Amino acid sequence: MSVRMNGFEQLALAGHCMLATLRQLGRGGLWVPWMVLGILQGVALLMLAGFAHPWVSVVMAPLVTWLAGADALHYPNVFRVLPALHARAAFVVDALFGVVAIGAATRLFAARFANQPIPAGDGLRSAAGRWWTLLIAHLPLQLLVLGLSFGIPEWLQARGSSGVTLRLAILAGFGGALVIQVIFVMIAPLVMLAGLGVRDTWRELPSLVPKIGVAAVAIAVVATVVNFPAQMLGRFADRIVDRGAPELVIGLVAIQVAVALVAAFLTAGSITLVYQSLIGDPGDEW
């Protein structure tokens, strides 16, 4: 089954799907993939903050030095750069394990919206079995986001570009990342629900964009709006350190992680229901 909708109809559908997903916030089983990802993000955060601990210093101290310079090794400087350090660590965690969380969530949401819920473990096993496909299918977009978010701004800064140029580059990178996110969210349904491989997934994307692209844009924008205020909290790290409570920055980054997971929950559920409604069987509940 495939249903064609114009742009306005897709916007209305996106709103309906986001509301339907919000009504699922209290279902613990749907949170399991994100809780696992959150634990991994938390471990990365604690390892960065506690890089000097004997258990991890052999690996983490050189890593912190490479990413933030030798000054970060002196207390409490690491907390000044902790949000930026964790953003880089989170990128790696998301690239390797976040794709499994997305895949599992897609499978769980699809079953829930079809009125045939499955255990969280089944969703995780299903996604883990397709880990390689999910990883490779998402990898080109992950690399583009890496270049836009970190590579270009750092290259301009190394060249001594003006503040205006840097801000414009960051703004352009933000817009580019949003466009990439629109394509990004379409991959998991093709892999997990349509059962496509990497090559077929990328072949199918151009034909999928006209069918659900407007809805995907709306969902990506809302998720970005939800996530944006929390990501701006990183700017307060210096102020927190200067006021003599550097360890509170760990809590600040933890808030960023939690909000990002909520945004990911909303995105995965909404795009899954959009896909079911326009491409696959929407199920009894919808």
Predicted segments, located by residue:
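Short cytoplasmic-facing helical segments at TM-TM junctions of multi-pass membrane proteins
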Residues: G197-V209
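Membrane interface segments of multi-pass transport proteins and intramembrane proteases
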Residues: L156-R167, L171, R235-P246
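Hydrophobic alpha-helical segments embedded in or immediately adjacent to the lipid bilayer
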Residues: W131-V164, A172-I187, V226-A230
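Short, hydrophobic/aromatic alpha-helical segments in well-folded domains
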Residues: A20-T21, D122-G123, I187, E204
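Juxtamembrane transition segments at transmembrane-helix termini in multipass membrane proteins
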Residues: S2-A20, G26, V36, L40-A84, ...
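Loop-to-transmembrane-helix entry motif
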Residues: Q24-V32, A127-L134, H138, L208-A216
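Alpha-helical membrane-spanning segments of integral membrane proteins, especially the hydrophobic core
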Residues: L82-A95, I118-L146, L166-G175
